[in-house]
């Protein structure tokens, strides 16, 4: 809330900040009230002892003071818990209660003095031990409370409080010259106050001219940032809590919408179909990423002994102590003669820590040439090393580690880069521009780079490349230093880890992409803050505070894990409804524009390491580790501060190092994005979730031939997609899905004796129940995607009712041929509308299985009636019975799909109807999809005289059928991107429901034994054809549905 006004002065504390202090004092005074009451009325005192009589009189008076304090503190607690952050009207009487409490405090002060007098007179002579101890406790407690109140008053004292009250009173009446003068005095007073605070914060440092200038610039920056804002520090804390809740609510609302391209949020960043992932399967991309991880070790070593001990708190101290000689053995050589160390401590701990860091990482080929530990404002420590393994000279700049570094960070005005020969104006962060100029000057004066490149001419150091690295402040300084050194070293490369957001202007940022690679981890705060970003953050903070109607204590307490979360203020709350109660600010104060600052952005090409957030487990269950992914970030996308408990933790250098390594670990474990998404997302499609289908090529087993319908023998006709699916197994791990396996002859024969549709229904129903039990919370996970992989169906736009169960059983479609090898396909969850998708697939399976069973025995019945070598006797007998029934003119039972003169009947089988109802009961929650009978009529011609191969006649039926293929739920959606629309470098290929070849073309998955008309009924049953298998044109393919 606005600062409370007491004694006609504004204080840096709000009336709703007094809840906890009042509760603490109330409990303390209640405890002493009980103790003193027991001592006074429960004990018998000697009437002849003067000390006892004085104690009784003093105690009774103090009981009255304690009772008054308890009443006043209860009133303070009650008033502080009323109203909202900016709704101060219910707390208007707080100042009068404080006047009463301060008057009681004065009386307490008098009684504390009396207690000291009593102790000096009677403490040694009084024989009543209880009286002496109680009096001593009361006096000590009183003085502790009094001193605490005095310290608190000094902390919340605002030097500009009187001017602020006058300015507010003047603005209420009119705007005139007096208002301008008061505002000017207020800004100057606030700048002076901030400067004094900075000097107190850096009281142990020696002040130089540059440091004094930094004090002034930062003080004016803070004064301007907080000008006209009548808020207190606790309001900022509550605002951060509310802002985090609002950001999370907005992300959930975006995911629930159906008319946007955002698929998920990873580390607060939106993931769309255009998101570019690092293609780690590409050798060049993998080499580049490993190079980024490698040089992070150099940036980490620049922090010296503090970071070394932080990473290795146990054995690190022993390692340093063994190498340090300190001042006891100055003659002991610790470094090579060619190593220059500047301003290290007496033990040389920083230089030793840098060397130990490389030794611990087995980087023995790294030689330290120069180490500067000099630390001042605009003068950042750095070191230069020669890496003989990589044939590079490395300049590593330290990040923020001292208060002086913080001053350099806070000097964030735009400064012109001292680089000539370019078009436009290149601007950079002032503090880091000055630091880069200092390092460049130091390198030239000490001829450090000449020493490095001439370190070992026999090993070719003269032709080594130059690398500049840094983290945080060092990252920004390294990027700007690269601008300064690039004219002399055109092949220079820079790696900036967690660089500041307000670093380079747009022109300079675009140019830096040629030689700078930046790394950002998760929700790191630093790459998202600059002057322009802070202005937006300021507006968001004020807006969320203005909309809040909850008490501050409830908001802050609700942010803890042990207390239920506070309610998020609704956006529909009319701000004007409380305008009369918010007289603390002028109407234009919330919309004032800060001084126009040039937008600055992070440098180079940004690798954004993001990760998912697994659902929190109970205390007895093991927490699932998050999965890390690397994507290419947009420099202009880091324009909003994402409030999170991890926003500071993910900026630490060793945490960044761990994040980079976890991307490689997840990739090596095969945790790819699409398959992880298949486990947790709510509406994946069949092909998009399995871009790399597993093909297991196994020889035919010795023994009886497999029955019809249990194995898939793909024809040898060469297709255009055969080159990408010829591997025995994909590089991707299909975790969460059972692998395709070859049935044994015995199991195959037993399965063949059952009705294929019944086998399908039983197996699929059991598999579906197990799959629904294993479903996890819907949270997007994704990793490295290549050009051939698709994320189209990775759709996070879901409603709350579909977050637990959406998907349908995997139907295993196989074809059988006579010769060749066997390939098994393990499909995944079908398309977005599970009820419709599975019923269409089931219908096609049922229709074609009956069709294949009834049409194939015709040749055998017309021939000799013998059993062909390719078919088992049982299958031949079934075919004979079917053929005989057909010849005899028998009528098929009602509910079966029988073949009459080459035409299908118009009603599905009972098994199909039963399973369709089961699917509807699970998935058809919204009742928007077509009914099963409608689908059946759409797949099977209504007229008994029409030929089966003709398909739908009217254009409307054709349109419905096509939309049933591509849009299963028949609901209009935004235009979809297909295979050719994604950029090759994006790492994601998009398709409606088809897999892609390595060239980005749609793969032809039509079985060669079926006609184009028959494929209309089998559009959901997709297979792919490897190279080298041909089809016999004279034989009819058998299509049987098999479920595992």
Curated annotation (Swiss-Prot):
Alphabetized, the UniProt keywords read: Calcium, Cell membrane, Cell projection, Endosome, Glycoprotein, Hydrolase, Lipid degradation, Lipid metabolism, Membrane, Metal-binding, Phosphoprotein, Postsynaptic cell membrane, Synapse, Transmembrane, Transmembrane helix
- Single GO MF annotation: lipoprotein lipase activity
Supply the EC number(s).
Answer: 3.1.1.116
What PROSITE patterns does this protein's entry cite? LIPASE_SER (PS00120)
Keyword Transmembrane helix assigned to the entry: answer is: yes
Any idea which residues bear Phosphoserine here?
728, 730, 733, 744, 784, 786, 808, 810, 835, 849, 954
Regarding protein family, the annotation reads: Belongs to the AB hydrolase superfamily. Lipase family.
Name the chain's protein.
Diacylglycerol lipase-alpha
- Could you tell me the gene encoding this protein? Dagla
């Amino acid at each position: 809330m606005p600062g409370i006004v007491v004694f006609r002065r504004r204080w840096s504390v709000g009336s709703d900040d007094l809840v906890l202090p009042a509760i603490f004092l109330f409990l303390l005074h209640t405890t002493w009230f009980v103790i003193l009451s027991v001592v006074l009325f429960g004990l018998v005192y000697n009437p002849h002892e003067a000390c006892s009589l004085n104690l009784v009189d003093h105690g009774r008076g103090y009981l009255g003071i304690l009772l008054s304090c308890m009443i006043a503190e209860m009133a303070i607690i009650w008033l502080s818990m009323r109203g909202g952050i900016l709704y101060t009207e219910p707390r208007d009487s707080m100042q009068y209660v404080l006047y009463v409490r301060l008057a009681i405090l004065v009386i307490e002060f008098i009684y504390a003095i009396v207690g000291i007098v009593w102790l000096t007179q009677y403490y040694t002579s009084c024989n009543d031990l209880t009286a002496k101890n109680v009096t001593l406790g009361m006096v000590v407690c009183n003085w502790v409370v009094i001193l605490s109140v005095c310290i608190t008053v000094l902390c919340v004292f605002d030097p500009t409080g009187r001017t602020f009250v006058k300015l507010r009173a003047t603005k209420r009446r009119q705007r005139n010259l007096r208002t301008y003068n008061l505002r000017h005095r207020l800004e100057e007073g606030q700048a002076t106050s901030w400067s004094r605070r900075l000097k107190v914060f850096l009281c142990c440092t020696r002040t130089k001219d540059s440091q004094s200038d930094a004090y002034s610039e930062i003080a004016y920056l803070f004064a301007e940032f907080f000008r006209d804002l009548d808020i207190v520090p606790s309001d900022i804390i509550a605002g951060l809590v509310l802002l985090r809740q609002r950001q999370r609510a907005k992300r959930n609302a975006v995911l629930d919408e159906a008319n946007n391209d955002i698929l998920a949020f990873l580390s607060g960043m939106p993931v769309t179909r255009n998101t570019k992932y690092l293609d780690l399967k590409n050798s060049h991309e993998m080499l580049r990423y490993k190079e980024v991880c490698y040089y992070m070790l150099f940036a980490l070593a620049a922090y010296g002994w503090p970071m070394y001990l932080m990473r290795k708190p146990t054995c690190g101290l022993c390692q340093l102590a063994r190498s340090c000689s300190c001042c006891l053995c100055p003659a002991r050589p610790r470094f090579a003669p060619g190593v220059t160390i500047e301003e290290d401590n007496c033990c040389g701990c920083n230089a030793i820590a840098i060397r130990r860091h490389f030794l611990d990482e087995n980087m023995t080929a790294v030689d330290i040439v120069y180490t500067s530990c000099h630390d001042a404002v605009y003068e950042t420590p750095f070191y230069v090393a020669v890496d003989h393994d990589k044939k590079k000279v490395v300049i590593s700049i330290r990040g923020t580690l001292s208060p002086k570094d913080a001053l350099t960070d806070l000097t964030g005005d735009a400064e012109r880069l001292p680089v000539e020969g370019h078009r436009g104006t290149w601007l950079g962060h002032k503090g880091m521009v000055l630091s880069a100029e200092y390092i460049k000057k130091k390198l030239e004066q000490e001829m450090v780079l000449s020493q490095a490149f001439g370190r070992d001419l026999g090993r070719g150091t003269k032709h080594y490349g130059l690398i500049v690295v840094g983290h945080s402040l060092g990252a920004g300084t390294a990027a700007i230093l690269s601008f300064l050194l690039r004219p002399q070293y055109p092949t220079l490369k820079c790696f900036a880890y967690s660089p500041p957001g307000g670093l380079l202007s747009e022109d300079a940022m675009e140019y830096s992409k040629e030689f700078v690679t930046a790394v950002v981890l998760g929700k790191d705060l630093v790459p998202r803050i600059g002057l322009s970003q802070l202005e937006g953050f300021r507006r968001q903070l004020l807006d969320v505070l203005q909309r809040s109607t909850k008490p501050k204590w409830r908001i802050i307490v609700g942010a803890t894990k042990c207390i239920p979360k506070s309610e998020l203020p609704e956006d529909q709350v009319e701000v004007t409804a409380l305008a009369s109660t918010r007289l603390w600010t002028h109407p234009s104060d919330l919309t004032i524009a800060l001084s126009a600052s040039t937008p600055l952005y992070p440098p180079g090409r940004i690798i954004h390491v993001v990760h998912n957030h697994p659902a929190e487990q109970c205390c007895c269950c093991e927490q699932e580790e998050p999965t890390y992914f690397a994507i290419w970030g947009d420099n202009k996308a880091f324009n909003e501060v994402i409030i999170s408990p991890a926003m500071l933790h993910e900026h630490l250098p060793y945490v960044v190092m761990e994040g980079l390594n976890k991307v490689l670990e997840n990739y090596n474990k095969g945790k790819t994005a699409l398959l992880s998404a298949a486990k947790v997302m709510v509406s994946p499609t069949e092909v998009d979730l399995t871009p790399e289908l597993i093909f297991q090529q196994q020889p035919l087993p010795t023994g009886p031939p497999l029955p019809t319908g249990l194995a898939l023998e793909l024809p040898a006709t060469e297709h255009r997609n055969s080159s990408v699916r010829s591997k025995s197994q994909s590089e991707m791990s299909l975790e969460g899905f059972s692998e395709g396996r070859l049935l044994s002859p015995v199991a195959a024969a037993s399965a063949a004796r059952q009705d294929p549709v019944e086998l399908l229904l039983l197996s699929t129903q059991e598999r579906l129940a197990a799959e629904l039990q294993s479903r996890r919370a819907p949270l997007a996970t994704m990793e490295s995607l290549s050009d051939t992989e698709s994320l189209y169906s990775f759709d996070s736009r879901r409603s709350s009712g579909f977050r637990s169960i959406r998907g349908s059983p995997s139907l295993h479609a196989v074809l059988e041929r006579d010769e060749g090898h066997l390939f098994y396909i393990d499909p995944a969850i079908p398309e977005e509308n599970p009820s419709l998708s599975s019923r269409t697939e089931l219908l096609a399976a049922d229709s074609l299985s009956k069709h294949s069973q009834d049409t194939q025995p015709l040749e055998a019945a017309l021939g000799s009636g013998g059993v062909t070598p390719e078919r088992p006797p049982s299958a031949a007998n079934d075919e004979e019975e079917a053929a005989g029934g057909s010849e005899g003119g028998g009528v098929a039972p009602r509910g079966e799909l029988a073949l009459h003169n080459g035409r299908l009947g118009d009603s599905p089988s009972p098994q199909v109807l039963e399973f369709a109802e089961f699917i509807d009961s699970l998935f058809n929650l919204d009742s928007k999809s077509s009914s099963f009978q409608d689908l059946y009529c759409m797949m099977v011609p209504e007229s008994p005289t029409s030929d089966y191969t003709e398909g739908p006649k009217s254009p409307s039926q054709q349109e419905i059928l096509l939309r049933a293929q591509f849009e299963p739920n028949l609901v209009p959606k935004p235009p979809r991107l297909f295979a050719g629309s994604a950029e090759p470098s994006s790492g994601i290929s998009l398709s409606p429901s088809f897999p892609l070849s390595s060239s980005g073309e749609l793969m032809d998955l039509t079985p060669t034994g079926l006609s184009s008309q028959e494929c209309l009924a089998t559009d959901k049953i997709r297979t792919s054809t490897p190279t080298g298998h041909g089809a016999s044109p004279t034989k009819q393919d058998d299509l049987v549905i098999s479920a595992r």
